[in-house]
UniProtKB/Swiss-Prot annotation:
Chain ranges of the SF3 helicase domain: 452-602
Post-translational modification: Phosphorylated. Sumoylated.
Organism: Human papillomavirus 73
Function noted in UniProt: ATP-dependent DNA 3'-5' helicase required for initiation of viral DNA replication. It forms a complex with the viral E2 protein. The E1-E2 complex binds to the replication origin which contains binding sites for both proteins. During the initial step, a dimer of E1 interacts with a dimer of protein E2 leading to a complex that binds the viral origin of replication with high specificity. Then, a second dimer of E1 displaces the E2 dimer in an ATP-dependent manner to form the E1 tetramer.
Name this protein carries in UniProt: Replication protein E1
Modification sites for Phosphoserine: S90, S94, S108, S121
Assigned protein family: Belongs to the papillomaviridae E1 protein family.
Spans annotated as DNA-binding region: 187-353
Catalysed reactions, semicolon-separated: Couples ATP hydrolysis with the unwinding of duplex DNA by translocating in the 3'-5' direction; ATP + H2O = ADP + phosphate + H(+)
One of the GO BP terms on file: DNA replication
Gene Ontology MF term list: ATP binding; ATP hydrolysis activity; DNA binding; DNA helicase activity
Enzyme Commission designation: 5.6.2.4
Taxonomic lineage of the native organism: Viruses, Monodnaviria, Shotokuvirae, Cossaviricota, Papovaviricetes
Assigned keywords, A-Z: ATP-binding, DNA replication, DNA-binding, Early protein, Helicase, Host nucleus, Hydrolase, Isomerase, Isopeptide bond, Nucleotide-binding, Phosphoprotein, Ubl conjugation
Glycyl lysine isopeptide (Lys-Gly) (interchain with G-Cter in SUMO) cross-link, chain position(s): K559
Amino acid sequence: MADSGNWEGRCTGWFNVEAIVERKTGDPIPEDENYDGGDTDESEMGDFIDNAHIPNIYAQQEIAQALYQSQQANADNEAIRVLKRKFTGSPGGSPDMKRDEFIDKQLSPQINVLSISSGRSTSKRRLFEEQDSGYGNTEVETYETEVPGLGAGVGCLQNVNEEGNQIVSPRESSSGSSSISNMDIETESTPITDITNLLQRNNAKAALLAKFKEVYGLSYMELVRPYKSDKTHCQDWVCAVFGVIPSLAESLKSLLTQYCMYIHLQCLTCTWGIIVLVLVRFKCNKNRLTVQKLLSSLLNVTQERMLIEPPRLRSTPCALYWYRTSLSNISEIVGDTPEWIKRQTLVQHSLDDSQFDLSQMIQWAFDNDITDDCEIAYKYALLGNVDSNAAAFLKSNAQAKYVKDCGTMCRHYKAAERKQMSMAQWIQHRCDLTNDGGNWKDIVLFLRYQNVEFMPFLITLKQFLKGIPKQNCIVLYGPPDTGKSHFGMSLIKFIQGVVISYVNSTSHFWLSPLADAKMALLDDATPGCWTYIDKYLRNALDGNPICLDRKHKNLLQVKCPPLLITSNTNPKADDTWKYLHSRIKVFTFLNPFPFDSNGNPLYQLTNENWKAFFTKTWSKLDLTEDDDKENDGDTVQTFKCVSGRNPRTV
């Protein structure tokens, strides 16, 4: 290829090889064909075609085409990148995208690559179309645009990217900024389907209420008291169910019988089908969700077609409606009528709704031995459904005043009752209020376990209960965990005595509970407490009258009740309190309190056991004032603060 002649010869041969397509390599060449490239052929063909610049032209065209394709590819990639950034954050894509397509694209972004369809599909027309507001937020139908390839004329689809977002083809993006601005649609706006469902759900209850009023002639809300929470419990419910199948509506009464104590069923027909109105009282309290699930399973009706609220219990018109409709032939009744309907419709129940009587409330508190104000208020309010006076109490606007007055009067009556009884009568009264079945041996065995002789203890207890001077105080002394406090507390609980604490000794009123007590306990007396007793309470230990200071009241002179003291200090072993030695009787508890293998006390010091103990030792304790009770009756008159009433006549 150094000389021009040889190069031109090969070029001519190249054209001959292209023309001879069917000759194979290795075939023999005929002799009549000359491929030597002589001077004669070169001179004959040299002036026919000027091909000196052909290789350079082809090279330039190939370079330009490759450069153009590279530029177009970069432009396409840039346009795709810009659109991806623009629509990032809207994984749902267009609002018209179907749910299945959205799920598929979320699970596999490359699912569109495997599609065998033509891809030319438009979104279907929706049932509720959004009106065009003119602000460019209208939903538009998207078409797949075919973008022809610039190299070999092959088209490709470029309208949806991997994330399901609509993008613009390179041809449209190169036409100017106006085409891109037309595609600037806010994809994160609320879908029209969600808004429609929301409107339908909000308007559903209004539509049901309107249809109910049209069919039954009165408003549903006039019969019920709405509950805001679906989890609030109630026993009575008013249920309206729309579009019930006739066969299920007829069998509803028998289906509900196993769940309810009372059923009032009405069925009317309208354009929507059968509307069932039922007043039910369940056997136990239920909330709205439970009632919805029950009716949905029995009637095969969705919860959106139900109205469920509790009835108005204090509305006379509502009670009259249920009473009047129960007498007609459109209603089916099962069970006894609820008391709130009877109370407002029947004559006798109306007469029972009298005014509140405080004396009945006081009598109830006295008979049940309830003196705490909060306990009186709570337990008496629970009787509102069975007691007419309690119902009147609940209707009153002065409940707090009534509770305070009731508690005050009940405490006064109880204090007067205790003061009227002797110690023997009071112990007998406490025994009457205690159950039988106790074992007196547990108390005796515990005293024997602590090495306390039973007969001296019994003699001291007899003098202690009588309040004999110098015998009015018993001290239980011993190391910790020997059962002193347990023994003393069990006795005070049975006698229903009071407990005083030295921690309140800085107050002038810390001894005021002794004014109304039959027996008192001072637990865990320390050396400082013994010093205080030696200085100020010698007369109290003697059993003589003392003067007590009460808050907001005058000083009260009373005889100190029998006083039981527990202590880890033996006052008789210290001469500092030598003036107390003759005023107290000390019993020593030295052994730890015994427990069984389960951790329970080995000796049960209960009210039943104390009742059995006093019954067994009644004569030895000289509690013989009421020996003739069986013949003469009870000497204590039964308390009654309610005046007699004549039966009311109509």
